[in-house]
Amino acid sequence: MATQQKASDERISQFDHNLLPELSALLGLDAVQLAKELEEEEQKERAKMQKGYNSQMRSEAKRLKTFVTYEPYSSWIPQEMAAAGFYFTGVKSGIQCFCCSLILFGAGLTRLPIEDHKRFHPDCGFLLNKDVGNIAKYDIRVKNLKSRLRGGKMRYQEEEARLASFRNWPFYVQGISPCVLSEAGFVFTGKQDTVQCFSCGGCLGNWEEGDDPWKEHAKWFPKCEFLRSKKSSEEITQYIQSYKGFVDITGEHFVNSWVQRELPMASAYCNDSIFAYEELRLDSFKDWPRESAVGVAALAKAGLFYTGIKDIVQCFSCGGCLEKWQEGDDPLDDHTRCFPNCPFLQNMKSSAEVTPDLQSRGELCELLETTSESNLEDSIAVGPIVPEMAQGEAQWFQEAKNLNEQLRAAYTSASFRHMSLLDISSDLATDHLLGCDLSIASKHISKPVQEPLVLPEVFGNLNSVMCVEGEAGSGKTVLLKKIAFLWASGCCPLLNRFQLVFYLSLSSTRPDEGLASIICDQLLEKEGSVTEMCVRNIIQQLKNQVLFLLDDYKEICSIPQVIGKLIQKNHLSRTCLLIAVRTNRARDIRRYLETILEIKAFPFYNTVCILRKLFSHNMTRLRKFMVYFGKNQSLQKIQKTPLFVAAICAHWFQYPFDPSFDDVAVFKSYMERLSLRNKATAEILKATVSSCGELALKGFFSCCFEFNDDDLAEAGVDEDEDLTMCLMSKFTAQRLRPFYRFLSPAFQEFLAGMRLIELLDSDRQEHQDLGLYHLKQINSPMMTVSAYNNFLNYVSSLPSTKAGPKIVSHLLHLVDNKESLENISENDDYLKHQPEISLQMQLLRGLWQICPQAYFSMVSEHLLVLALKTAYQSNTVAACSPFVLQFLQGRTLTLGALNLQYFFDHPESLSLLRSIHFPIRGNKTSPRAHFSVLETCFDKSQVPTIDQDYASAFEPMNEWERNLAEKEDNVKSYMDMQRRASPDLSTGYWKLSPKQYKIPCLEVDVNDIDVVGQDMLEILMTVFSASQRIELHLNHSRGFIESIRPALELSKASVTKCSISKLELSAAEQELLLTLPSLESLEVSGTIQSQDQIFPNLDKFLCLKELSVDLEGNINVFSVIPEEFPNFHHMEKLLIQISAEYDPSKLVKLIQNSPNLHVFHLKCNFFSDFGSLMTMLVSCKKLTEIKFSDSFFQAVPFVASLPNFISLKILNLEGQQFPDEETSEKFAYILGSLSNLEELILPTGDGIYRVAKLIIQQCQQLHCLRVLSFFKTLNDDSVVEIAKVAISGGFQKLENLKLSINHKITEEGYRNFFQALDNMPNLQELDISRHFTECIKAQATTVKSLSQCVLRLPRLIRLNMLSWLLDADDIALLNVMKERHPQSKYLTILQKWILPFSPIIQK
């Protein structure tokens, strides 16, 4: 157990702060701030975690196993971390050293785990190679001490004497009691945790908590006389049979191994380096700079290999790097001077010493003495399995040893490990993969459960006939070669039990070929150096000490007969076979297997590891690669096999200056490499890609990602064709029928895109029609941004002169189709394969509901980018231009859209746009709304009394406000972290000089920023100068106007609109605005300042057409405006507030002189001559919108004038009173004549209440009505009238029906209304809320009627029902209704009051 000590306050920063500016640019956010927040979070987690030596994690294999659940998106691979002493804690990405407890969370791209370990805890005992109990991942329990105990058996026959030897038992094995070990016959040797049986001489080490010494003794040395004297045969058999792994293996298999490691395993983090062999180090110098002053032989001799960068070399053992070599340098001396603790150097030194230093043995010499050959048998109970024999007695034995040496030489040669994955170039060969462990799972042939395995477990379980299955290019060959290499190198004791290992490729064999012939052809230098008889004798003698690694297996009938017999009759030969087979070829071999090893998807961190090794000279490209796939997590899965990594490498090597690194580049390169590899069968490949593309396309549009044999047959896919398996995977586990998937969902989309282009580009009409049919299935703009985004990105990147215009036309017409705009359905099957799309679609739906215009603008620009990318990629810009120009007509785009090449090639298209939107956002904190003022709006004496069952209908305001503040803080933190890079004005339209065509209207939207920097000022000057008209929208940005004075003064004639909200202008800023000669619109709101210079000088704005003033407090603008201002004849929009104490004559005169007025809003508490106001408004024949607020309204003169407003579209009389029934009746009849009315917000009062049914009946004449609101004016009869009018054909375009605070409607009235309401096909929002003092405790029948009603409203997305008290059953019923509703993904039910007090709970 780990020592339970609290973590110290050690602060660790893994970030390289010099790289943070570069990361900021790549991430699009403030990396410095992000790093600070991450470090704070990590420090909090670090403080919670326990420290102290963790004996449970001293085994590297166990540490490696903890990374099974590690996040694949990482720059570090598990082997590097485990070898550096770390295990995965499971807390975020945290890893911890078993020895010094260092906790790291980050995985740097430029530094390895061992480097960060040395950097933060250089005094860690593990790093200093102290005896801290580390167990190397390939180490074994059986030890081979060629010594015997001093005094022989007699001295330790007594348990007490054995126990006394444990007085210095290491601290890291305190979980194993010396009493139990001594009882089992063991004596402590004094070396690490190795013990030796006093009777049989067997040595065991690497003890871990939970080990049973008797079981270990029985497993490894079952013939021990002492063991047999203490345990029965049945007990010994039970111990052996219950042992996990190492079937039929005893200690003698390891003790008598012919394979000996040439190098020590002192440095755990490099114990399987391929560069442990000098020949392989030499081979790494093939690209060594010729001008270098140092010879490669000397460098390789000193343990150094070439990194491929400049003249930098690295030690395979200690990992140290050396560079800048000069004439006369001695690599060995420099290595020794810089890295004196290097295990490789220490081993060289100890090997050179003739006489061992006896003093260094200490206590070990007292316990052990060297065993001579004459008395060796006295320490080993049973002789070796393969005894040394005279050559005449056993010729096979000598031949076997010779064969062992030849095989080891073959497997450690550079040629063996160097094989190009795609047979195109040698840039990415198998040797670059040997350091990356594959992700492997084991499954018993009769059990569905898979168990993830790490390599040490795989090696321990090798037995009889096993297969490793995986997709094409999944790394099967790499795994087999790695096993052969590790065996030959001697650095994997787990494999030392095999005396011979044969790696044989079955792809180049003949059925009648003999085993010796195959071995000679593939592995041995001399033909005929081993005979068939010799091989047969060796196998018969060695049995399970022979391992066959059989690669490229296809089917049993196609392999050599001799190999077939080894598989089919393995019970006779008892050899071990590991057979590599593609998943689709494994069926006929399964009958001979008990265990299958399955290679899973290639982890993303392996991809990063390989790219880091090969392209460490271009870290910027690697960082971009990491950032891209970090932002697009679903695309990480495309690196499914090493073949895709090979495709990336081939592309990067071939195009070193091509910046592309995304999924499109990966897939294109992969297909290109397949094409090059299969030149001889180009037509077959083409047909395979086409048929698989057909399957992919059909599956994509039907949200199908798994296919059966029938699906493949229908699409013409041949599953037996090897090329098919380069595109698809076959799965057979626990299925009556196999099923197939493409290598990844994204790859399926890519192939589907290729097929769509092929169909549209075909000369056959039926193919073109089929392509258009598929294309038209893309009928939702939202899906183009979300679910179809990747697919369309692939389509747009594939060139096609015929398909280009068709695709462009379809995409650009999507946004003009209202039905398609609202067709935003979501397919759950698709989301199973891309769950991250779900959140994206929720955000898009929210944007669509809250701000349809912003949604529409975003989708429009997205489609434009896709369309133009398609046009340019297919070289069909001229043919596509008519569609593009039609699309641009009257549209608003963002400033970034002008960077598109199209606006450079066709700048005249700018004139078609309505405007360009340029947002500028700062980091100021917007004023937070204070809800405490609402407490004064509620009468606390009216606190509702409710049952406990209905408590969920209310939420305390303080709790709600606290949650809201927390969310606002999170949003602010995120927004503050966003890096607001200045717009790029170097491409597209901005390359034009001079700019003959200008931006028709520039909308500058400024929020939360006071002052801009010089860079932004220069950008504004450039953009302003390229704009015909400029509109400024300023919010909470005091001082902004002054900071952009140079830009405004250069373009003041272009500014036509200025909107000022929540800020006070300085005197200088007001003076600057007054110099704008072309200002047509002025809006001022959200401030208590009257802008003391602007309003008295409004007459300076000679072109002013729109004036909107909404000031806080009792401020009357018309009291300060100049007398000349009302004489203007061009006001079109007037939104104003005045106070009672001022003469309204200026306002009346202004209206009189504004015949073009079309929007009029007035807020006033008293108007002395309302009749004259209405008379003047009647003269405004173009008036389309009227809104009256506050208490100045007079019903009689208004109704008298109302028939004259024949163009009226919006009438808002919210809060106005109609007490007179006669006037209200006239009002009702007149409403029926306003045929253009779209929004009707009705007044209140007794008069309206009495004529409500008449008003509703008159609404049948209002065919354009979209919004209808009744407030305090309905009862049971009138509300049911709404349903009757709807049934008879009224309200067909109604989208919003507001029926709130109508307390005279009873529950029965609502129920009747719900039961009758139907035929409102466009209703999106229904409000039936009540005041909290007028709650309705709904009966089950009412809730049921409501649910049925909502189901009849197919487009309803919001239901407001405050003060409806619903119990758990009612809520459950509504939830069931939501799931069944056509808008189930969008329908929101608002049922909870937010109050400054809690209701009284009635018990």
Swiss-Prot record:
UniProt-listed InterPro entries: AAA+_ATPase, BIR_rpt, LRR_dom_sf, NACHT_NTPase, Naip, Nlrc4-like_WHD, NLRC4_HD, P-loop_NTPase
Please list the residue ranges covered by the BIR repeats: 60-127, 159-227, 278-345
Tissue localization of expression is: Expressed in motor neurons, but not in sensory neurons. Found in liver and placenta, and to a lesser extent in spinal cord.
Q: Which Pfam family is one of those matched by this entry?
A: NLRC4_HD
Q: One biological-process term from Gene Ontology?
A: positive regulation of inflammatory response
- Is-annotated flag, keyword Metal-binding? yes
| Domain named NACHT: residues | 464-758
What SUPFAM superfamilies does its record include?
A: Inhibitor of apoptosis (IAP) repeat (SSF57924), P-loop containing nucleoside triphosphate hydrolases (SSF52540), RNI-like (SSF52047)
Share the domain note from the entry: Both the BIR and NACHT domains are essential for effective inhibition of pro-CASP9 cleavage. BIR3 domain binds to procaspase-9 and the NACHT domain interacts with the NACHT domain of APAF1 forming a bridge between pro-CASP9 and APAF1.
Q: How does it assemble?
A: Interacts (via NACHT domain) with APAF1 (via CARD and NACHT domains). Interacts with C.violaceum needle protein CprI.
Q: What is this protein called?
A: Baculoviral IAP repeat-containing protein 1
- Source species of the chain: Homo sapiens (Human)
The gene name on file is NAIP
